[in-house]
């Protein structure tokens, strides 16, 4: 029997998590901030948007941390078992990346809350706060939780490179060559930890698969697309690809490359079948 405190906690969580207003408010504010930051050349406006962006990032982080912690306590396991929980974690991971990098990289500060808001919106729309249930025995391994967390951090970084790519194309259109070059360099810098994380995530997933299913790799749909995604994002790290040396081409590549992430996370679940169909 659950304790009274656990019942109270679950009731509080259900009431808190069911509110859609905060998500829509986060999305609206972060979208406005991203647009103003991208288009404004006024230093005073830039300072104001940076301040508001910092406050919004902290508010969102506290909120998502609370939701994840409550769901963890109520369920008794790390909230990494379905699409709703992983998108919430991606929102949280994006905010962590934003706070770590915002002092040195302004575009991350500008787009972090927006990407996090989109992740929360997708979580709200797709699964809509699914019922908390016990995990199947095969999903109770700590390796699986670590695998998912590492992969979602890499997706957060890939998402940021896509938004930076969009800003880079806007800078190209506005003839801001220096800014365009800086954004391309930032995207390439972010690719190093992002590709490393997805590679580590795939490796940990293979170890878990061997423990659970008796084989490291089965060419499952999601495994295959995760590998494809890693290879696609690895390409810009090779200096001998001349086409990607041009900033505009780099930004276009980052936008198109994110389609592989969308296919890996969403497309596989809806259009293909495999052992990851529950994810």
Model-derived features: positions:
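Polytopic transmembrane helical bundles with strong interfacial aromatic enrichment
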Residues: 1-279
